[in-house]
Amino acid sequence: MRFYLDENVPIDVLRIGRSLGLDIVSSHEVDNDALTDPQQLDYAAAHGRCLITINRDDFIRLTNEFASTDRPHAGVLIIPQGLSQHAARRVVDAILQYVERRGSMPADYLCDFLRA
């Protein structure tokens, strides 16, 4: 499974995730920090990446909008807001457990929550 971190996810999640073998790209790396939420999800969808965010309300709504307009995406994982930088390892562990449960294939329109 391939992941895309939006601009609100701590960059340590990227660093730790990669060190543990996850295929992760951040919005910072591809110069997408200024994109709107729909554009972030469009980017992730176009690249077959499951988007990871802390922006629960907007991305739940966007997932429904994409589904109702037949615009597939590779899923959205929502992590808790207000995590400290020290929580990045717990977030990555939750992502690894998620991949173990779900397998390596993304699920169109999936919106799920990770506990870290």
Regions found by a protein language model. Give the residues of each.
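Short beta->alpha connector loops at strand-helix junctions that form conserved
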Residues: 28, 55, 80
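Acidic, metal-binding active-site segment of PIN/NYN-like and related structure-specific nucleases
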Residues: 37, 43-62
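Short, surface-exposed loop/turn motifs that are enriched in glycine and acidic residues
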Residues: 29-30, 49
